[in-house]
Amino acid sequence: MRNTLLPIVGLGLLMAAAPGLAHHALATTYDTRQSIVLKGTVMKINWENPHVHLYLQADDKTAPDWEFELGSPNMQIQNGWKLDTFRRGDHVVVTAYPARNGSRLGYASKVSLSSH
């Protein structure tokens, strides 16, 4: 019985971990071999688990808004961010990995205030 139970339990644990591993596989959604730099105005920022999301209207204003995923709220706080570090209307520069599917989605690796 023990020889049969161990592989079943092991398989169950592996299957339970798979969604978490897939969720955190950055390279499946974003092209980590290249980065983009965009300047624009913060439209909104959502501090929600599992990730902070920043919505940006690019300076050219002809393009649709961009959405940038960041780390978890806890990770952003550990990196020195506060809930009011960036506010609606702030002009920022975002460096990000673009979405593989060509959508206006990216994973932000750096966000900083811009002087225009």
Q: Which residues are covered by each model-predicted region?
A:
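A short macromolecule-binding patch
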Residues: K61-S72
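Conserved hydrophobic positions within beta-strands
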Residues: G40-V42
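Short nucleic-acid-contacting surface segments enriched for D/E, G, S/T with interspersed K/R
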Residues: I77-V94
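Short aromatic-glycine-enriched beta-strand elements
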Residues: E48-A58
